[in-house]
């Protein structure tokens, strides 16, 4: 039976490139002269350190722009709360979302089942597998999910006949 997987993955190398480009732009921008603003990435967490809330907002806007240029959807970024840091600075942790959480997977399965398509959707860890008897049914399911606006971007891979 034909099947495909619904995943939500981001290329961390592209995220790293976007972070490096953001750091480079911050060091050369005139409005950041004398600023101690920094950006660091460890695994799936980007830490933004800035002088004040305004500069923090500027850094996040630059980061989002660089993400878009690197073909990384900004919806992958989960911005945490702004917290005070040492030396009258502010810090914000940005988590890069990887995989589909169980609540979001249930929402995807429910959307497919409510559409009354001739496919079955099953949650498998951090992905959703959709199987059907015909390839056309699977393509209808992909079209349905692309037409929906979810809070997290989806990719469709592992399409098998």
From Swiss-Prot:
| Gene Ontology annotations for the cellular component aspect, listed alphabetically | cytosol
Keyword annotations: Nucleotide-binding
SUPFAM superfamilies registered for this protein in UniProt: YajQ-like (SSF89963)
Question: GO: which molecular function terms?
Answer: nucleotide binding
Q: Per the record, a Pfam family?
A: DUF520
Q: Does the keyword Nucleotide-binding apply?
A: yes
Q: Which domain of life is it from?
A: Bacteria
What does this gene product do?
A: Nucleotide-binding protein.
The family classification in the record reads:
Belongs to the YajQ family.
What this protein is called in its record is Nucleotide-binding protein Mmc1_1670
| Species of provenance | Magnetococcus marinus (strain ATCC BAA-1437 / JCM 17883 / MC-1)
């Amino acid at each position: 039976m034909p099947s495909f997987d619904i995943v939500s993955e981001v290329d961390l190398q592209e995220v790293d490139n976007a972070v490096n480009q953001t750091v480079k732009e911050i060091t050369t921008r005139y409005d950041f002269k004398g600023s101690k603003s920094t950006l660091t990435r460890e695994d799936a967490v980007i830490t933004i350190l800035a002088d004040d809330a305004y500069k923090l907002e500027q850094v996040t806007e630059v980061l989002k722009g660089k993400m878009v240029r690197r073909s990384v959807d900004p919806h992958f970024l989960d911005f945490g709360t702004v917290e005070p840091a040492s030396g009258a600075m502010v810090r914000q942790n940005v988590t890069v979302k990887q995989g589909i959480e169980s609540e979001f997977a249930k929402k995807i399965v429910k959307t497919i089942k409510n559409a009354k398509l001739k496919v079955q959707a099953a949650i498998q860890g951090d992905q959703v597998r959709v199987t059907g008897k015909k390839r056309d049914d699977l393509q209808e399911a992909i079209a349905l999910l692309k037409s929906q606006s979810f809070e997290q971007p989806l990719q469709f891979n592992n399409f098998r006949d």
